[in-house]
A protein has these predicted regions:
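Short amphipathic alpha-helical segments
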Residues: 4-8, 63-67, 107, 111-114, ...
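Charge-rich, low-complexity N-terminal segments
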Residues: 1-39, 77, 84-86
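Short, surface-exposed beta-strand-loop junctions and turns on beta-sheet-rich folds
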Residues: 36-38, 59-61, 100-101
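Hydrophobic residues embedded in beta-strands of well-ordered beta-sheets
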Residues: 27-30, 49-51, 90-92
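A short acidic-to-branched-hydrophobic micro-motif
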Residues: 40-58
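Generic structural signal of hydrophobic/aromatic residues within well-ordered alpha-helices
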Residues: 9, 67-71, 126
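Well-ordered alpha/beta subsegment
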Residues: 80, 84-113, 117-132
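Short, internal acidic amphipathic alpha-helical interface segments
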Residues: 52-91, 97
Length: 132
């Protein structure tokens, strides 16, 4: 039996112990949550040839140029992924992309762990900024 990329990704996620809170097989995406690890509505989307991993972090306040500079410095320390802005520049997201073709469980787990580590390390700073 040949598994689709979507089925493979779902298997990896379930194998890691995550609960899938939402699934859209047509769009080939799942949403996972793990409050203890700071994972909330984490979207994992198969967009061949890549897998997109994305989570909303905070809304961006109006004057955020200093914070954007700080985010670029933080990005330099991240093992995987990066803090990015949405197209409108109004929302801060964590985002990572992986190649689907030879994706393995360790690689996917590493990207998810990177989000948890980034939030553990920088959550206070992000919250302080979000409050203005």
């Amino acid at each position: 039996i040949i598994m689709t990329d979507f089925e493979k990704v779902k298997d990896f996620i379930l194998d890691m112990g995550f609960a899938i809170s939402h699934e859209d097989p047509k769009e080939e995406l799942v949403v996972i949550n793990d409050d203890e690890r700071g994972i909330k509505n984490f979207v994992i989307d198969c967009e061949a040839p890549i897998l997109i991993l994305e989570q909303v972090i905070i809304p961006m306040p109006e004057d955020s140029s200093d914070f954007c500079r700080r985010l670029l410095q933080i990005n330099r320390t991240l093992v995987h992924g990066a803090f990015v802005l949405d197209e409108e520049g109004t929302t801060l997201l964590f985002r990572d992309t992986l190649q689907l073709e030879n994706l393995d469980r360790n690689e996917l787990e590493g990207s998810i762990d990177a989000l948890s580590l980034a939030l553990a390390e920088y959550a206070d700073e992000l919250v302080t900024f979000a409050r203005g």
